[in-house]
């Protein structure tokens, strides 16, 4: 028994000595942040990215490739690489197609600095830190491609922006040539997209003050059968909706919108019209006005700044 105790004590002292000689231990599995610029880099782009993060609490990207690392060689002796890119996936619902985005990049520092100046002057003043995207991808052009079979993609449309959970991409090409009204419209559309994405991710409790007016009707058919789109919109507004149900770009008559469609339409209404304008335009539809006020409170609580 005494021998056993001595062996245990000796092992314990050995472990203490070994740990003491190793110094402070650090976790070996810390994941590298590939969104962040190298803080020791001296090139102008890296300095711009670091300064932006310090000021604005979001990462800044000019390329959707986060890392491109060699893995080794294949059996033919050719190099293999691991590529990680920014994934701005299109939000998948029952009425959207899987899609991807193809980007063209800004090529000069003047373009990149101009893009940063634009978002700092026009977008960030409306977004508190908690509402800002994790990262901004500022590029020249965005093209959206969709697929029917999940394998082959076909061109769908050019986009001025794309909003994802980890990144918001903005097409900044030609921005300096836009009129003041066009620049304002671009700003408004981006803010609307960011808020629509943010609101769609909120809990039922956060959205309860809004969805309580329409949750029983989402995605259901009306007992009435409107013959025209105008008749359909009267039916929608009477029930508190400002948008019909859409499949792609096509409205369905007599079918109430989904929850996501209802949220998105009212976020846009709140960001584009004042309370006085809404009360005038929807004077005959009191539920619409109540939902407008409820949504306005929600986005203010999320950090939107008027």
Where are these regions (language model features)?
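Intrinsic-disorder/low-complexity loop/linker signature
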Residues: 77, 150, 230-233
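Acidic/His-rich structured neighborhood in mature extracellular/periplasmic domains
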Residues: 102-225
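Metalloprotease/metallohydrolase-associated module, dominated by Zn2+-dependent proteases
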Residues: 216-306
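Context-gated lysine
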Residues: 2-8, 31, 49, 54, ...
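Sec-dependent bacterial lipoprotein signal peptides
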Residues: 1-22
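Acidic/polar, low-complexity intrinsically disordered N-terminal segments immediately downstream
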Residues: 19-116, 126, 281-306
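Generic alpha-helix detector with strongest preference for long hydrophobic helices that associate
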Residues: 7, 96, 100, 175-180, ...
């Amino acid at each position: 028994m005494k021998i056993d105790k001595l062996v245990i004590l000796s092992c314990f002292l050995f472990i203490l000595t070994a740990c003491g000689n190793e110094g402070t231990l650090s976790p070996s599995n810390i994941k590298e942040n590939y969104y962040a610029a190298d803080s020791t880099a001296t090139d102008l782009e890296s300095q711009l990215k670091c300064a932006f993060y310090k000021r604005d609490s979001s990462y800044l990207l000019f390329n959707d490739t986060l890392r491109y690392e060699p893995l080794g060689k294949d059996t033919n002796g050719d190099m293999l690489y691991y590529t990680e890119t920014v994934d701005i996936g299109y939000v998948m619902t029952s009425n959207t197609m899987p899609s991807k985005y193809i980007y063209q990049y800004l090529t000069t520092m003047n373009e990149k600095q101009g893009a940063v100046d634009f978002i700092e002057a026009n977008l960030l003043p409306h977004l508190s830190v908690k509402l800002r995207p994790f990262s901004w991808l500022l590029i020249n052009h965005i093209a959206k491609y969709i697929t029917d079979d999940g394998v082959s993609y076909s061109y769908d449309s050019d986009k001025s922006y794309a909003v994802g959970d980890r990144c918001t991409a903005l097409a900044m090409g030609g921005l300096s040539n836009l009129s003041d009204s066009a620049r304002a419209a671009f700003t408004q559309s981006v803010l609307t997209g960011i808020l629509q994405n943010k609101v769609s991710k909120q809990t039922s409790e956060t959205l309860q003050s809004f969805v309580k007016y329409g949750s029983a009707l989402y995605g259901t058919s009306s007992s009435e059968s409107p013959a025209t789109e105008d008749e359909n919109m009267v039916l929608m507004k009477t029930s508190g909706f400002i948008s019909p149900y859409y499949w792609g770009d096509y409205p369905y008559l007599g079918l109430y919108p989904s929850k996501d469609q209802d949220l998105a339409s009212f976020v846009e209404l709140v960001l584009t019209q004042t309370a006085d304008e809404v009360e005038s335009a929807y004077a005959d539809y009191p539920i619409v006005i109540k939902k407008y006020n409820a949504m306005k409170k929600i986005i203010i609580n999320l950090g939107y700044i008027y």
